[in-house]
Amino acid sequence: MSEDVIAEIKRDYIYSLANQGDRADGRKFDEFRAISVETGVINKAEGSARVKIGDSQVVVGVKIQPGEPFPDTPDSGVIITNLELVPLASPTFESGPPREDAIELARVVDRGVRESGAIDLSKLCIESGQKVWMVFIDVHVLDHDGNLMDAASLGAIAALKATKIPNSKFGLGEDVKLPLNDVPIGVTAVNIGGAIMLDPSLDEESVAPCKLTVITNKEGAISGMQKSGVGTLTPDQINHIIRLAKEKANVLREKLEGIQ
C-alpha cells in the first residue's frame, strides 16, 4: 500500500472521528495530553527546563552574558532565541541550515516573550549604551509528536523562571533572579472538519489545513498569534480559539508555579 493511500486513510479516519465528536486518542476537543515540566536539567546553563506534552519533548537552555545593547535601546537588555530540530526527533528532520518551520517556531517563542514584556529588559542594563545582559534562549526539540509550539513556549518561560543572572561570574556582585514581569503561555488549536481541537497530535497536525497559536499573558491580553497552513478560519472560530487559549493558559501556568 502506497504512502499516499495510507495518508488518505488516516485523514478520513481522523475526520470521521471529528464528525462524531471524538479524537483518535480519546481526548476531548479542548483537552491537552499529559504535561510534565522539569527545571535544572542543564547544569552549565543559567536556567533550563525539559517539557513533555504527550510524546513531544523539548529542552530549553538559557545563557546570559554581557554584550553591547542595540543602538535604539541603549539601556535595555537583549533577547536572542534559537531553535534546533534535532534529527533524532523525527524522520523528517535533517541536519543542516535551519528549516522554515524551525525559524517559525523560534520567532513565535521569541515574540511571546518579547511582546508580553515577560523579561524586564530595563533591569538588564549594566552600563548605559555600553554593556547590557544578553539573554540567549536555546530550544532543542528532542521528540516530535505534534504541538511543538506550545511545548517550546512553555519550556522557554519555565527555563526563564529558573534563570539567575551570573553577576559573580563577571565580577559584578551576587547572582540574582532574572527579573520577570509576566508568564506568557501559548495554546495551539487546529480546525479539522469544523471541529476546533487543542494540543494537536502529529497525526492531527498532518491532516489539518491550518493551525492557530495564541499567546496570552497573566491578564489574558494577547501578546502573540501565529497561523500556519493554507486553510482558513472563520471569525467565530478564531474567537472560539482565543477564548479557549485564555482558559487553558491559566491551567498551563499552574504547571510553572513553584519554579524558583
Curated annotation (Swiss-Prot):
Q: Name one Pfam family in it.
A: RNase_PH_C
One GO CC term, this protein: cytoplasmic exosome (RNase complex)
Q: Name one GO molecular function term.
A: mRNA 3'-UTR AU-rich region binding
An example GO BP is: rRNA catabolic process
Q: Report the subcellular localization.
A: Cytoplasm
The alphabetized UniProt keywords are: Cytoplasm, Exosome
* Record family assignment: Belongs to the RNase PH family. Rrp42 subfamily.
- What protein name applies here? Exosome complex component Rrp42
Question: What species does this protein belong to?
Answer: Methanocella arvoryzae (strain DSM 22066 / NBRC 105507 / MRE50)
What would be the name of the gene that encodes this protein? rrp42
